[in-house]
């Protein structure tokens, strides 16, 4: 087995944003790679990839679901900040200060960061004690927005997907 190839493919697949309900790009990528290797993959109704890999007797079958954790915009706040609802088992404390991408249904992809509301440790005396939830965190867009109208003018709306940077690292010792 060519481990460099396997790790390269894994890193490529992990870099594709694919929270549940938004998996077409990842499933298409995986299907394309399997097709290039001479297999005949099929996509399931729910967005997974099914592929018979062959073999003698009982053939080996691959069934892959390619969804990851993510979020969806629940509210655009009056100050232009965004609250999200989790998709899958996403936890706010695990993604505080993480970079994210918002996929607008209308106008492209925008970047931002999930952070604690009132994130200044110099001003917020309870910063260290504040419970991190999706009610106490917000996405700050990397755009010059100051209001909900500014955000909507970009084409961003409630229901748009929010995907977090997976920060995939493969160490020299083989840890991923």
Regions found by a protein language model. Name each.
Residues 1-176:
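N-terminal hydrophobic/helix-forming segments and targeting peptides
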């Amino acid at each position: 087995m060519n481990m460099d190839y396997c790790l390269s493919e894994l890193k490529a697949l992990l870099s594709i944003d694919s929270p549940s309900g938004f998996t077409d790009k990842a499933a298409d990528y995986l299907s394309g790679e399997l097709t290039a290797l001479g297999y005949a993959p099929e996509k399931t109704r729910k967005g997974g990839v099914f592929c018979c890999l062959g073999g003698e007797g009982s053939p080996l079958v691959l069934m892959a679901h390619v969804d990851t954790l993510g979020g969806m915009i629940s509210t655009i706040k009056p100050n232009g900040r965004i609250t999200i609802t989790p998709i899958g088992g996403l936890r706010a404390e695990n993604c505080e200060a993480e970079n994210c991408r918002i996929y607008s249904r209308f106008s492209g992809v925008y970047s931002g960061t999930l952070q604690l509301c009132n994130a200044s440790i110099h001003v917020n005396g309870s910063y260290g004690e504040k419970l991190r939830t999706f009610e106490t965190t917000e996405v700050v867009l990397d755009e010059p927005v100051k209001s909900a109208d500014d955000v909507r003018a970009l084409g961003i709306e409630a229901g748009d997907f929010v995907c977090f940077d997976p920060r995939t690292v493969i160490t020299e010792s083989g840890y991923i």
